[in-house]
Swiss-Prot record:
It is found in: Secreted. Expressed by the skin glands. GO terms for cellular component: extracellular region. It comes from the Eukaryota. This is Cruzioseptin-15.
Amino acid sequence: GFLDIVKGVGLVALGAVSKS
């Protein structure tokens, strides 16, 4: 659902921040 997409994007964003 929509919330699943939001959660997925949030996890990807956190992952990108952690890598940098």
